[in-house]
From Swiss-Prot:
Residues annotated as the enzyme's active site: 71
GO cellular component: extracellular region
Signal peptide: 1-21
Top EC category: oxidoreductase
Job description of the protein: May constitute a glutathione peroxidase-like protective system against peroxide damage in sperm membrane lipids. Since the purified porcine enzyme has very little activity towards hydrogen peroxide or organic hydroperoxides the protective effect is not likely to be exerted by its enzymatic activity. Instead, may protect sperm from premature acrosome reaction in the epididymis by binding to lipid peroxides, which might otherwise interact with phospholipase A2 and induce the acrosome reaction.
SUPFAM superfamilies in alphabetical order: Thioredoxin-like
Tissue-specificity statement: Proximal caput epididymis.
Protein name listed in UniProt: Epididymal secretory glutathione peroxidase
Entry EC number(s): 1.11.1.9
Subunit organization: Homotetramer.
Keywords: Oxidoreductase, Peroxidase, Secreted, Signal
Entry's family note: Belongs to the glutathione peroxidase family.
Length: 219
């Protein structure tokens, strides 16, 4: 009973830390003195058939997104399709990385993820038009190395981390991803540019990217 009551009272803290970020910034510019690039990293595609070296994206603006099928933010999936389609002429590439660390909202095997997206959430025959990679961790001891690099390159926009009782990974770091659908933009030189919290509207992300592209062209 004591444990149940403790969990009950901690739950609002968890939600405040992981979902409610309105009191903080929606995005943050990355550090200016980043060492290394995403070209030092790689990943396997969702079906495991292709090993992609991220150096193949040299010259592109790349948006990294940690995704989940059964999340309240899964509605961002179709919006990411639109973002990819509209900004592809400007050199934008969207990359999705399924992760089950936040509310266990990506429970399926790699082979089940596309079916879940197509028939359950967002459903309606949805198919992502951007590359998805194998499911993996984005925080903790077993986090994918490219996310170690991205997180260390960019401060988190939110000062809230959440209730320790609901964090399933170790070690916990201040730059850790807080929830599904956080985003990192990487420039054409492979260096991270900016980072958004999960609940930032895709329309805002698009506006921020367009502003960055305009500034990038004038430099």
């Amino acid at each position: 009973m004591t444990v149940q009551l403790g969990a009950f009272y901690l739950f609002p803290l968890f939600m405040a830390g992981f979902v409610q970020t309105n009191s903080n910034l929606e995005k943050m510019d990355c550090y200016k003195d980043v060492t290394g690039t995403i070209y030092d990293y790689d990943a396997f595609t969702l079906n495991g058939n292709e090993h992609i070296q991220f150096k193949q994206y040299a010259g592109k603006h790349v948006l990294f997104v940690n995704v989940a099928t059964y999340c309240g933010l899964t509605a961002q999936y179709p919006e990411l399709n639109t973002l990819q389609e509209e900004l592809k002429p400007f050199g934008l590439v969207v990359l999705g990385f399924p992760c089950n660390q936040f509310g266990k909202q990506e429970p399926g095997e790699n082979s089940e993820i596309l079916l879940g997206l197509k028939y359950v959430r967002p459903g309606g025959g949805y198919v992502p038009n951007f590359q998805l990679f194998e499911k993996g961790d984005v925080n903790g001891e077993k986090e994918q190395k490219v996310f170690t690099f991205l997180k260390h390159s960019c401060p988190h926009p939110s000062e809230l981390i959440g209730s320790i009782g609901y964090i399933s990974w170790e070690p916990i770091r201040v730059h850790d991803i807080r929830w599904n659908f956080e985003k990192f933009l990487v420039g054409p030189d492979g260096v991270p540019v900016m980072r958004w919290v999960h609940e930032t509207p895709i329309s805002t992300v698009k506006s921020d990217i367009l502003a960055y592209l305009k500034q990038f062209k004038t430099e």
